[in-house]
Amino acid sequence: MATATDRAPHQVQVHTPTTQRVDVPRRGYDVSGGGIKTLLPERGPSTSQIIAVLVGVPTGGTLLLLSGLSLLGTIIGLAIATPVFTFFSPVIVPAVVTIGLAVTGILTAGACGLTGLMSLSWMINFIRQVHGTTVPDQLDSVKRRMADMADYVGQKTKDAGQQIQTKAQDVKRSSS
């Protein structure tokens, strides 16, 4: 078993950081005259940050303007349409309900039909995968099985006929 005295000595090198400077922001009043500068980064923004601001501010401002115009148009339209809706509500509400129910019924019927077609398609594909054959192959297989069955029945009929003939001859011999 190896002990600490059996091993060769290792050398360890220790490097002290001479180029890194750690700034710890101080709280309160700075008497050295640094003031607020100690809280700011030592270098300015990168080029990509400047481009992002130059592109983002006009784009964001334009989108904010468009959303404000959209909100203003909605409020004006609602202010104009509210008296019309109030006046025609006995006609509009039943018409909207009827149209809504009709559209819902048509969409439901279409969804049920589509679901049925998808289910039928899935079943056909599943059956094809289980059997591994197509319809013409299945028909050929059925024809072969029918021919084999006809040969089998014919052979059995011949065998039965021969057995009957043999028994008849045995009976004839035994009676004579």
From Swiss-Prot:
Query: Where does the protein principally reside?
Result: other
Q: In which tissues is it expressed?
A: Expressed in seeds (at protein level). Not expressed in leaves.
Q: Where in the cell is it found?
A: Lipid droplet; Membrane
Q: Which residues carry this modification: N-acetylalanine?
A: 2
Q: Where are the transmembrane segments?
A: 50-80, 95-117
Q: Which domain of life is it from?
A: Eukaryota
Check the record and name the Pfam families matching this protein. Answer: Oleosin (PF01277)
Which residue intervals make up region (Disordered)?
157-176
What Gene Ontology cellular component terms go with this record?
membrane; monolayer-surrounded lipid storage body
- Topology of the protein relative to the lipid bilayer: Multi-pass membrane protein
Per UniProt, which keywords does this protein have?
Answer: Acetylation, Allergen, Lipid droplet, Membrane, Transmembrane, Transmembrane helix
* Subunit and partners: Homodimer. Forms oligomers.
Classification via PANTHER family = OLEOSIN (PTHR33203), OLEOSIN 18.2 KDA (PTHR33203:SF63)
* Role summary: May have a structural role to stabilize the lipid body during desiccation of the seed by preventing coalescence of the oil. Probably interacts with both lipid and phospholipid moieties of lipid bodies. May also provide recognition signals for specific lipase anchorage in lipolysis during seedling growth.
Return the protein name: Oleosin Ara h 14.0101
Q: Which organism is it from?
A: Arachis hypogaea
